[in-house]
Design a protein with these regions (language model features):
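Phosphate/nucleotide-binding beta-alpha loop and adjacent structural elements of enzyme active sites
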Residues: 1-195
Length: 195
C-alpha cells in the first residue's frame, strides 16, 4: 500500500490495527539535525516520515516491531528500532488489539540514552505516558504526545502536566472517543526559550 505522500507499507493480515497515516501529529518543524524518538511506533507511520527529514530517528515498539522493521526497509530509510515499551523498567505485559506480549520496559530517560538523545519526542503509548518523570523531558525541544484518560493507563500525572505547562508553550487537540477507550487528546508542545 502506498500513502498519498509516497510512504509505502506492507499490507499483511494481522490481529492488530496497522496505522499508516498520522495527521494528528505535527511534524513540519522536525529539523535535519534533530534526534527524533518515536515511542509507540506501530508499523512506522510517523518514524518513516520523520526519517525522510532527520537521519537520527529511533522507534520504540513492543508489539509490531517485525512489521515496523519491514516497512522501514521498504522505504529505504534509517531508523533504529528498540523492541521495548515505555514504563517503569520492569517487564510488562503489553496489549494491542488483543495481541499480548511480555516485553521489557524502560523509563523515558533510559530510552533517550539508548537513542543517543532526543530533541523531538512523539509518544503514543496507550496510557504509559503518565509514567514519564518531568525531569526526563530536559532538553527536549518539541513534544507530540497522545494523552489518555482512564480506563487506558492510570490517572493523569499532575506533576508532569504542571512541568510541561511551566516549560513549554502548548496546545491540546481533544479527540472525541466513545466506548471503552475513554477520552484522549494530542499535546503539541514547544520548549520555551529561557529569558
Amino acid at each position: 500500500m502506498t500513502a498519498r505522500d509516497g510512504t509505502r507499507f506492507l499490507t499483511v493480515s494481522t490481529p492488530y490495527r496497522q496505522v499508516t497515516e498520522v495527521p494528528e501529529y505535527w511534524m513540519e518543524d522536525i529539523l535535519a539535525e534533530d534526534r527524533v524518538l518515536d515511542i509507540g511506533a506501530n508499523i512506522g507511520a510517523f518514524c518513516i516520515r520523520a526519517a525522510k527529514i532527520s537521519r537520527h530517528v529511533s522507534a520504540v515498539e513492543p508489539v509490531t516491531a517485525d512489521l515496523l522493521e519491514a516497512n522501514i526497509a521498504l522505504n529505504g530509510v534509517e531508523v533504529r528500532v528498540i523492541r521495548a515499551a515505555l514504563g517503569d523498567g520492569s517487564p510488562s505485559e503489553i496489549e494491542w488489539d488483543n495481541v499480548r506480549s511480555l516485553v521489557p520496559t524502560f523509563r523515558l530517560r533510559d530510552l533517550i540514552r539508548t537513542a543517543g538523545g532526543c530533541d523531538f519526542l512523539k509518544c503514543d503509548c496507550e496510557g504509559a505516558e503518565w509514567q514519564i518523570e518531568p525531569g526526563d523531558l530536559a532538553g527536549i525541544r518539541r513534544i507530540e504526545m497522545e494523552l489518555h484518560q482512564p480506563p487506558i493507563g492510570g490517572l493523569p500525572n499532575e506533576e508532569l502536566l504542571r512541568s510541561i505547562g511551566e516549560q513549554y508553550t502548548f496546545s491540546i487537540d481533544r479527540i472525541p472517543v466513545h466506548g471503552p477507550l475513554g477520552q484522549m487528546g494530542i499535546l503539541h508542545a514547544w520548549l520555551q526559550s529561557p529569558d
